[in-house]
From Swiss-Prot:
Family from the record: Belongs to the universal ribosomal protein uL22 family.
UniProt xrefs under InterPro entries: Ribosomal_uL22, Ribosomal_uL22_bac/chlpt-type, Ribosomal_uL22_bac/org-type, Ribosomal_uL22_CS, Ribosomal_uL22_sf
Purpose of the protein: This protein binds specifically to 23S rRNA; its binding is stimulated by other ribosomal proteins, e.g. L4, L17, and L20. It is important during the early stages of 50S assembly. It makes multiple contacts with different domains of the 23S rRNA in the assembled 50S subunit and ribosome.
Protein name: Large ribosomal subunit protein uL22
Biological classification of the source: Bacteria, Bacillati, Mycoplasmatota, Mollicutes, Acholeplasmatales
Assembly description: Part of the 50S ribosomal subunit.
Record-level GO cellular component terms: cytosolic large ribosomal subunit
Gene3D superfamilies in alphabetical order: Ribosomal protein L22/L17
Matching Pfam families: Ribosomal_L22
GO biological process: translation
GO MF term (any one): rRNA binding
Claim: Cell membrane is one of the keywords in the record: no
UniProt keyword list: Ribonucleoprotein, Ribosomal protein, RNA-binding, rRNA-binding
Highest taxon of source: Bacteria
Organism per entry: Aster yellows witches'-broom phytoplasma (strain AYWB)
Length: 129
């Protein structure tokens, strides 16, 4: 049986990937209720963006794939580096330093815990043969 995964991607988010990864690491592997509670009370700039992305992925799972909301958990979540905006910061004697304003691409995949159980059962039955 093929597992059903719901996916949501936020591209060109104006948060540095290093800062976004701190928040993303908190919710990896958690169920949806725990992840939403963690993101609600995390005092980081990336937390509201990732919470919005999580809610979008949950909506995709419930509406498009007809999965049960209570059985969903975060299967994988990762942050890739987006493009960099290069800006000049004026320095002495007419020179300037480069400022790199970094952006992120955040990908979140959720699945149902029943999918996990069935895939484990298939692996066990396949290994016996």
């Amino acid at each position: 049986m093929e597992t059903k995964n719901a996916k949501a991607i936020a591209r060109k988010v104006s948060i540095a990937p290093r800062k976004a990864r701190l928040v993303v690491d908190l919710i990896r592997g958690k169920n949806i209720a725990q992840a939403q509670a963690i993101l609600t009370f995390t005092p980081k700039v990336a937390a509201p963006v990732i919470l919005k992305l999580l809610n979008s992925a949950v909506s995709n799972a419930v509406n498009n794939l007809k999965l049960n909301r209570e059985q969903l958990y975060v299967k994988e979540v990762f942050v890739n580096e987006g493009f960099r905006l290069k800006r000049m910061f004026p320095r002495a004697k007419g020179s300037g330093d480069m400022i790199k304003k970094r952006t992120s691409h955040i990908t979140l995949v959720i699945t149902s815990s029943t999918n996990l159980q069935t895939s484990k059962e298939e692996e066990q039955s396949g290994s016996k043969n």
